[in-house]
Amino acid sequence: MTPYIILLKGSEYNMSKWDKLLSRILSLSNDMRFDELQKVLESYGYVMKNPSGGSSHYTFRKDGCVPITIPKHSPIKKTYVEMVKNVIESEETK
C-alpha cells in the first residue's frame, strides 16, 4: 500500500487515520507507540499474548506466521516498527 494524497479543487483530501498510521509505519517513523502497532497487528489477525512474570515483552501470534515480540516501551525502536512493516507488506501482496 502506497501513501497517497488526493487533490480536490486545490485543497488536500485528508487521508483517513488508518491510512496515516500505515503511512507512518511504512516510512519507519521514530515516534510510534505500542498501542498503534498493536492495533495494526490485531487488524491483520494477530493475537496478543500478555507477558508473564513481570516482563514487558508482548508476543503477537498468527497461525502460519512467525511470532512477533514487541516490548511495551516508549518510543518503540525502529527494529520493531520494521517487523510490523514487513507484516503489512506481506499482507498487502496476498
For every predicted segment, state its role:
Residues 1-15, 90-94:
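Intrinsically disordered, low-complexity and often Lys/Arg-enriched segments
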Residues 7, 12-15, 60, 75-76, ...:
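Generic N-terminal leader/processing signal
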Residues 12-40, 87:
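A charge-rich, low-complexity, intrinsically flexible signal that marks solvent-exposed coils, linkers
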Residues 14, 20, 55, 66-69, ...:
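Basic helix-extension-helix modules of the SAP/HeH family
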Residues 38-76:
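Basic/aromatic recognition patch in beta-strand/loop cores that engages polyanionic ligands
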Residues 73-94:
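C-terminal structural segments of small proteins and small subunits
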